[in-house]
């Protein structure tokens, strides 16, 4: 049978639950030039892979003319039978729809929305490392940020080359929950 564990009050303190969604969305929006993208009428297809990313993207881009359509955005504990990883092998449907339905961009997020991949208008896969490289170039060249680049040990050597090209320091970190 099942054993139950008695719940006792914590004599050392209490738990405070806080919804940080509004603060998070505001923080992310502060890094986006919304004036530039507000009038753009891009058509974007986002595959959230049955994860948590849909509400954040909608809130971040609220007030723009970007038309967002979501796929795989229902609750599905088995993630629709696919691993919720934004790798090319898992994005066949996104690639097909972006190409056939003439989306300007496809975006894929993993289950907890901390990894990203993209699909170009013709259906070509854009690797996450390329996205990070483009972002680093944009921040340095267009935004004139001069800080270093941080990458995980699992990342490609692309960021090493970009850091060298931009003449900025490269920091490498280990991966895993203990770091």
Model-derived features: where do they sit?
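Gly/Ser/Thr-enriched, mixed-charge loops and adjacent short helices
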Residues: 1-101
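Proline/glycine-rich low-complexity loops and linkers
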Residues: 1-26, 120-179
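Short acidic, glycine/serine/threonine-rich loops at helix termini
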Residues: 55-59, 80-83, 116-122, 159-165
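Short acidic/polar active-site loop segments enriched in Thr and Asp
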Residues: 104
